[in-house]
Amino acid sequence: MAKKATLVDHGAAKGKKKAQSKVSKKNANKRLVVATNRRARHDYTILDTWEAGIQLVGTEVKSLREGKASLIDSFATIDDGEVWLRHLHIPEYSKGHWTNHSPRRTRKLLLHRNEIDSIMGKVRDGNNTLIPLSLYFSDGKLKVELALGRGKQDYDRRQDIKRRTEEREATRALGRRVKGLTG
């Protein structure tokens, strides 16, 4: 189920100071994750990551604050020196009307020029692709965790699964051994 994302404005009004509780100070810098791409780490070897802003319209932000988004099948491309996020699904805002956005429209990612140049060089090198790992709010602004990934072959996936099961079995055996000695 979708969770409702809420954020509190901690800014001070003009000339007046606003009292902050201890709870709001603790949560001021935390990430509020809206969506994650769980298949990305399974299907790709992650080589590098970046944090990018995203250009949105009002109803998209409202829909995201309700916790609704899907990163399935989404990817990023570089066209004319700009990074674009494609196939990100943000459903229409439930209380919107004729001003609602198109759910699967192409959205511009906001990065520094030197980051874009670096990404372009790495994508051109070989079988690399840009994939979003997560969408989250950071200090009230929506951010995208963008990753440079290389697609895994079937044998790579099998090796990863085998390695994880071996690690899991080793920790279980160690836990049983410790319990057997102490108990």
UniProtKB/Swiss-Prot annotation:
Entry keyword RNA-binding: yes
Biased composition annotated in UniProt, kind: Basic residues: 13-27
Cell compartments where the protein resides: Cytoplasm
Gene Ontology biological-process annotations: trans-translation
Keyword rRNA processing in annotation: no
Location of the region described as Disordered in the Swiss-Prot/TrEMBL record: 1-27
Bilayer-crossing regions: none
Swiss-Prot/TrEMBL keywords: Cytoplasm, RNA-binding
A GO term, aspect molecular function: RNA binding
CDD domains reported for this sequence: SmpB (cd09294)
InterPro entries per the UniProt record, alphabetical: SmpB (IPR023620), SsrA-bd_prot (IPR000037), SsrA-bd_prot_CS (IPR020081)
GO cellular component terms attached to this protein's record: cytosol
Function summary: Required for rescue of stalled ribosomes mediated by trans-translation. Binds to transfer-messenger RNA (tmRNA), required for stable association of tmRNA with ribosomes. tmRNA and SmpB together mimic tRNA shape, replacing the anticodon stem-loop with SmpB. tmRNA is encoded by the ssrA gene; the 2 termini fold to resemble tRNA(Ala) and it encodes a 'tag peptide', a short internal open reading frame. During trans-translation Ala-aminoacylated tmRNA acts like a tRNA, entering the A-site of stalled ribosomes, displacing the stalled mRNA.
UniProt family annotation: Belongs to the SmpB family.
PANTHER family named among the record's database cross-references: SSRA-BINDING PROTEIN, TMRNA-BINDING COMPONENT OF TRANS-TRANSLATION TAGGING COMPLEX
Annotated protein name in UniProt: SsrA-binding protein
Species of provenance: Corynebacterium kroppenstedtii (strain DSM 44385 / JCM 11950 / CIP 105744 / CCUG 35717)
Taxonomic lineage: Bacteria, Bacillati, Actinomycetota, Actinomycetes, Mycobacteriales
